[in-house]
Amino acid sequence: MSTAEQKTETKNPAERSTADVTLDYPIARSGQKITKLTLRKPKAGTLHGLSLTALMQMQADEVMVLLPRIVEPTLLEKEVRDLEPSDMLQCAMEVATFLAPKAVLGYPIESKA
């Protein structure tokens, strides 16, 4: 494992701007297989029209609306709905981690003063 990979793995989850999800069940698209998704930490505008409570509770319907907005490669709505439950859960867990305050994740809040 390279030093860069080690730094990425040990980085405070509250400070990550992306998260990689390796799919248990790859997505077939045009003769190719998508085996990994990269989720971007959503900004407030990306969450427009969504319930933060539902996202933190990892409610599938709410997560399915958010995923196409934050995932690379971009997924179609049908592809998101066809995700296997284990893959959906991995994505939902990353979303919840993105939204959780640092204090909830057990990391101290650094003072800027």
Give residue ranges: language-model regions.
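Short, surface-exposed, charged amphipathic helix/loop patches that serve as local interaction elements
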Residues: S2-A113
